[in-house]
UniProtKB/Swiss-Prot annotation:
InterPro entries xrefs: AP_endonuc_2, AP_endonuc_F2_Zn_BS, Xyl_isomerase-like_sf, Xyl_isomerase-like_TIM-brl
Matching PROSITE patterns: AP_NUCLEASE_F2_1, AP_NUCLEASE_F2_2, AP_NUCLEASE_F2_3, AP_NUCLEASE_F2_4
HAMAP family, per the entry: Nfo
Catalytic activity: Endonucleolytic cleavage to 5'-phosphooligonucleotide end-products
One protein family per Pfam: AP_endonuc_2
The record's free-text note on cofactor binding: Binds 3 Zn(2+) ions.
Record-stated family: Belongs to the AP endonuclease 2 family.
EC main group: hydrolase
Organism phylogeny: Bacteria, Bacillati, Bacillota, Bacilli, Bacillales
UniProt name for this protein: Probable endonuclease 4
Organism: Staphylococcus aureus (strain JH9)
A GO BP entry: base-excision repair
A molecular function (GO) term: phosphoric diester hydrolase activity
Cofactor: Zn(2+)
Residues bound to Zn(2+) 2: E144, D178, H213, E258
Length: 296
């Protein structure tokens, strides 16, 4: 089963360190940002330590790396040309890094229309993606299902479908299905996941889903908040998320946890991924998980 989490990529070890961290959590796949998600400071491809990273991955049976684009990219922005241009240029560079790392998909938040309206935002995203997807490599951009916070685009399957339909080289577009976001956007992920998936299939096609973000939600369905919770401790609940992780439709695609670190003290928070992954492998909820994470 391809199950992993977001892991860090930093220091001198870079990808090697990411692979070691994923192995220590008992993962078979993992997701990285190529640098801090809040800025555009990046190391050169030569400094990402890719060869050693791949050696560690081979040794420990890790595969299907996923890259996540930084949050600062907003190609839906119609009011500031510099924001749009930065997004297009930086996304092209990120795709080059993604290809060098050996990942097939880079996850992208479609963007926010910042008041110009959904139609204008979608048209701008299409314009940006058409600019980005001209070069000849095989990296896909995985558009993420969004919660609908603020002026986010991608809160409905229809919005994502409109983007995909407008892009010329749309064979290089995939979808990252985020359980928390989709729940927060109003879909009944908790009680009728197959119904949600059928709806997605009719509007977009389930074969477009190439990454799943597995997150519980701190808020009730339709809250449009996007606040992740640990597996089984939120409004979606363990049973629904366990069902999704083991779903036949997602058997061969990476399922990535982005759940929050545990702990009240901001200086002493601990990653939950090792124990959450064990729990999902055993298919048994552990109400003591958070306490056990702090005792690690």
């Amino acid at each position: 089963m391809l199950l992993g989490s977001h892991v860090s990529m930093s220091g001198k070890k870079m990808l090697e360190g990411s692979a070691i961290e994923a192995y220590e959590y008992g993962e078979t796949t993992f997701m990285i940002y190529t640098g801090a998600p809040q800025n555009t400071r990046r190391k050169s491809i030569e400094d990402l330590n890719i060869t050693k990273g791949h050696e560690v991955m081979e040794k420990y049976g890790l595969s299907n790396i996923v890259v996540h684009a930084p949050y600062i990219i907003n190609i839906a922005n119609t009011t500031k040309p510099e924001t749009f241009n930065l997004g297009v240029d930086f996304l092209q560079q990120e795709i080059e890094r993604t290809q060098a790392i050996g990942a097939k998909d880079i996850v992208l938040h479609p963007g926010a229309h910042v008041g110009a309206g959904v139609d204008a935002g979608i048209n701008k995203i299409i314009e940006g993606l058409n600019e980005v997807l001209t070069n000849d490599n095989n990296v896909r951009i995985a558009l993420e299902t969004m919660a609908g916070k603020g002026t986010e685009i991608g809160r409905s399957f229809e919005e994502l479908a409109r983007i995909i339909d407008g892009v010329h080289n749309n064979e290089r577009l995939s979808v990252c299905f985020d359980t928390c976001h989709t729940h927060d956007a109003g879909y009944n992920v908790k009680e009728d996941f197959d119904g949600v998936l059928n709806e997605f299939d009719k509007i977009i096609g389930v074969d477009r889903i190439k990454v799943v973000h597995v997150n519980d939600s701190k808020n009730d369905r339709g809250a449009q908040k996007d606040r992740h919770e640990n597996i089984g401790f939120g409004y979606i609940g363990f049973d629904a998320l366990n069902y999704i992780v083991h779903h036949d439709s997602f058997k061969d695609i990476p399922k990535i946890l982005e759940t929050p670190y545990v702990g009240e003290d901001k200086k002493n928070k601990k990653p939950p991924y090792k124990l959450e992954i064990e729990m999902l492998k055993q298919q048994q909820f552990d109400p003591e998980l958070k306490n056990k994470v702090m005792q690690q």
